[in-house]
Amino acid sequence: MESIDKIQGTFDAKGKEARPAVSDAVIKRLPRYHRYLGELIADGRLRISSAELSQIMNVTASQIRQDLNCFGGFGQQGYGYNIKYLYGKISELLGVTQGYSAVIVGAGNLGRALAATHMFGRRGVERLAMFDIDPKVVGEEIYGIKVYHVDELYEFCRRNEVTIGVLTVPKEAAYNVAMIMAHAGVKGIWNFANMELELEDRSVTVENIHLGDSLMKLCYEIKTRGEEKEIEE
């Protein structure tokens, strides 16, 4: 099995081997690999072929091999993939093993729902705190996470070296809160505010989540299939 560090590609200015550019499409598939491989481990599986994995992923076996070859391959001819090994390597690629931490800003319905989920811990992200401006919730604990006043956000993030900021605030407040987090050293922002957030500081990665867009895509698919059925009839 090839090491994750032994990736063929170009060399940087210091003579070190550089990882080739990876497409967004491949990056978006990595969490799916991680999820499905985790399920296979839970089922007691030890290895899997690219053909079988392609059926689970609903992509071609060739695409599976191309995706994984971007990071070194990880497979053996005639054996396929060691599931635990591949799961571990993809966990490394996704940062699951980095010990990232997060704060949630906004203790409304969405913020509370995110606080309740086990999603963070299962992906190696520790939720340290929540923040809000409502005096009725400041000082409380929501699913075991203490709520602080947003005025404490900057100092808390700096002191605890917070990696990820989760925004569940009204769109009018999103930019200012994001700037506070960026100045405090937060490396990434998961934005659920109803706006497209862009920061001048390109060292901060922003992932804009629009739940409404996903709902409208579903509505479109339902409508389109309904129209196709009418035509067939």
Task: Annotate each predicted stretch with a short phrase.
Residues R47, A51, I56-G99:
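HTH-adjacent hinge/linker in prokaryotic transcriptional regulators
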Residues A107-G108:
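Glycine-rich Rossmann-fold phosphate-binding loop(s) that bind the pyrophosphate
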Residues R122-Y143:
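NAD(P)-binding Rossmann-fold cofactor-contacting core
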Residues G38-I41, I145-E233:
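Phosphate-bearing ligand-interacting subdomains
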Residues G111:
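N-terminal Rossmann-fold NAD(P) dinucleotide-binding loop
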Residues M1-L46:
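Extreme N-terminal segment that seeds HTH/winged-HTH DNA-binding domains in transcriptional regulators
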